[in-house]
């Protein structure tokens, strides 16, 4: 029996349930084990105030203590610093990485009147929303997805911004009033992706889990998280990134794959947003992440990050 650790929220158990079901379909016995995390217990506090790994540390300790054999993480929640006790055995096919607006009366972002109250606690979303100059009032937003959605339907908030992937996984895409394109709002690095983690020495389990790995997703996430790690910005910093494997045609008419990466660093008040992009080979995803991070530094990203205090 493969014991899969997961947080207890509907979204987390749904995500982990897809992994359990895939393993069972492949002929392996698997079950979910619910693990309570610091982020769940302190649901009313800003994530940045709780610390690094608020949703992942307890899951990792459960792996280390042999309470579970593996854990399913929202990849964007994992610290970028490598922990030698563990390995990412698989990165399954990614859901839509983009952010989604859920607004009253079916409105899109540009239709919200100045002064509208929009909920999000992500510094990345706050910074990019402010940079759009729409005159929105932004308020902190924590809690599970249903709780957040209820704050719009109850009239407490005019709109919220959340990850589209989460709404997709719990079957609530009908509430989305606008999918925010990366030109409006770059997603968090690894948003929409899952990481299946196990003990570093558990090679038999790692090989089994690797059947669920998607090479394009792994390449994209590697580029995005390398950029984040190089910036030493932490998962709650105002940093956005999205990478995609795309098809190109060479001068001889042959189709080949490239990896594109876009990244941004912003001030918390949205007064300055620095953007950079690059293209490379999917099998050199890390190098692409380093290259785009270097370009961001050349454009002044270090000063923007130093303003808020750097957090690894």
Swiss-Prot record:
Record-linked PROSITE patterns: PORPHOBILINOGEN_DEAM (PS00533)
An example Gene Ontology biological process: protoporphyrinogen IX biosynthetic process
Record-linked Pfam families: Porphobil_deam, Porphobil_deamC
Source superkingdom: Bacteria
Residues recorded with modification S-(dipyrrolylmethanemethyl)cysteine: 235
Catalyzed reactions: 4 porphobilinogen + H2O = hydroxymethylbilane + 4 NH4(+)
InterPro entries per UniProt: HemC, Porphobilin_deaminase_cofac_BS, Porphobilin_deaminase_N, Porphobilinogen_deaminase_C, Porphobilinogen_deaminase_C_sf
EC category name: transferase
Cofactor: record remark: Binds 1 dipyrromethane group covalently.
PANTHER family from the UniProt entry: PORPHOBILINOGEN DEAMINASE
Function: Tetrapolymerization of the monopyrrole PBG into the hydroxymethylbilane pre-uroporphyrinogen in several discrete steps.
Quaternary structure, from the entry: Monomer.
Name this polypeptide is given: Porphobilinogen deaminase
Organism: Mycolicibacterium gilvum (strain PYR-GCK)
Chain's gene name: hemC
């Amino acid at each position: 029996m493969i014991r899969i650790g997961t947080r207890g929220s509907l979204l987390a158990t749904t995500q982990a349930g897809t992994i359990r079901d895939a393993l069972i379909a492949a002929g392996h016995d698997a079950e979910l084990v619910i693990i309570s995390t610091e982020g769940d217990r302190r649901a009313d506090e800003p994530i940045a105030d709780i610390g690094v790994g608020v949703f992942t540390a307890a899951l990792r300790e459960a792996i280390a203590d042999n309470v579970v054999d593996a854990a399913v993480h929202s990849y964007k929640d994992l610290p970028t610093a490598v922990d030698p006790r563990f390995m990412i055995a698989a990165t399954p096919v990614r859901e839509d990485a983009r952010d989604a607006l859920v607004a009253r009366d079916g409105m899109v972002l540009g239709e919200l009147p100045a002064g509208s109250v929009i909920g999000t606690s992500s510094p990345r979303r706050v910074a990019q929303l402010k940079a759009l100059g729409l005159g929105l009032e932004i308020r902190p937003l924590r809690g599970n997805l249903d709780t957040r959605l209820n704050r719009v339907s109850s009239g407490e908030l005019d709109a919220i911004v959340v990850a589209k992937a989460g709404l997709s996984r719990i079957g609530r895409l009908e509430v989305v009033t606008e999918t925010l394109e990366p030109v409006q709002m770059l997603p968090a690095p690894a948003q929409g992706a899952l990481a299946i983690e196990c003990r570093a020495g558990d090679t038999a389990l790692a090989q089994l889990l690797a059947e669920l790995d998607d090479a394009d997703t792994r390449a994209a996430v590697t580029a995005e998280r390398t950029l984040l790690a190089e910036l030493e910005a932490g998962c709650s910093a105002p940093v956005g990134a999205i990478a995609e494997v795309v098809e190109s045609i060479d001068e001889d008419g042959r189709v080949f794959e490239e990896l594109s990466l876009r990244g941004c660093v912003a001030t918390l008040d949205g007064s300055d947003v620095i953007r950079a992009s690059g293209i490379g080979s999917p099998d050199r995803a890390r190098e692409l992440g380093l290259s785009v991070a270097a370009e961001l530094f050349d454009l002044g990203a270090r000063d923007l990050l130093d303003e808020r205090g750097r957090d690894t």
